[in-house]
């Protein structure tokens, strides 16, 4: 008699997408980040749900309610620290997942890649509106500066900003709607994750060689499920250690002050995971140009599949392209550093050069090197 997991209508879906899923034998630890992102999403939704039970989305009470959660709610400090630092780990896994996709040519699964970009945008929006909720100084001014960038759009910009704010400045209406967005968008992201899965399982996973592995696959369970469990351990251990021993490592000291519209912080900056995009925004002196560059820094990923010129899918045997991609990684790290620094020389020039290099590598150098490597193969 067939097993229940193979015959039950619901369990069969779970079985086909996890337990008996045909998986390439040679996938490395770089393929662990998908499951780690799933873990991060579940952890963020659960901790966020408990925080929402005690949080008050009102400008007069938001700051105090966060302090109340940390001081008076049973294990509230731990839930809050896990949620705040969980976002950092979430983005770290996201960027490594994207980097793996770029290195091994996973972007050629266009459906999977495009739903992944949509997920990235949704999670970025969620993180941004979530950063505003504690109503600290950097929360308030970060929200004011970033949302006011929409005013750069011709004709509709000012109306759009006022519509988003719910008034003429970041105020109570803004905080209330940002809380609603922060609560709701992760559930939309969960639905998009299902789409991401759907597209991925339509084509099957890529592997380090970039070659078809249809003739050489094994079930996901037990081999890779145990490997994923080890990944969970290796993620949860440093996250818990950070939340317990150094919870404010990635936070901003200004957020220990209640939001004050009358006092501007000396240096306004977002969380570390947005700094590379913030540096690209600041590299353009023109406001509208900066906004377009900010959008392009993320949306440029959508054109990567169309710029693939190499006969080989993976970079595993393409040393020149490897060097180019590692240069891109270093460029992103430089942009992250520049984004967190004050806007002054020579840092401004370094940021502009790094921004130019970022787009040049993705749009020109990688496709050119693919063509050159094709010629070398001939």
Curated annotation (Swiss-Prot):
SUPFAM superfamilies: a domain/subunit of cytochrome bc1 complex (Ubiquinol-cytochrome c reductase) (SSF81648), Transmembrane di-heme cytochromes (SSF81342). Coiled coil: none annotated. The chain crosses the membrane at residues 33-53, 77-98, 113-133, 178-198, 226-246, 288-308, 320-340, 347-367. Heme b b562 binds at residues 83, 182. Keywords: Electron transport, Heme, Iron, Membrane, Metal-binding, Mitochondrion, Mitochondrion inner membrane, Respiratory chain, Transmembrane, Transmembrane helix, Transport, Ubiquinone. GO terms for cellular component: mitochondrial inner membrane; respiratory chain complex III. It is a multi-pass membrane protein. One of its GO terms (biological process) is mitochondrial electron transport, ubiquinol to cytochrome c. The cytochrome bc1 complex contains 3 respiratory subunits (MT-CYB, CYC1 and UQCRFS1), 2 core proteins (UQCRC1 and UQCRC2) and probably 6 low-molecular weight proteins. Heme 1 (or BL or b562) is low-potential and absorbs at about 562 nm, and heme 2 (or BH or b566) is high-potential and absorbs at about 566 nm. Belongs to the cytochrome b family. This is Cytochrome b. It comes from Indostomus paradoxus (Armoured stickleback). The gene is mt-cyb.
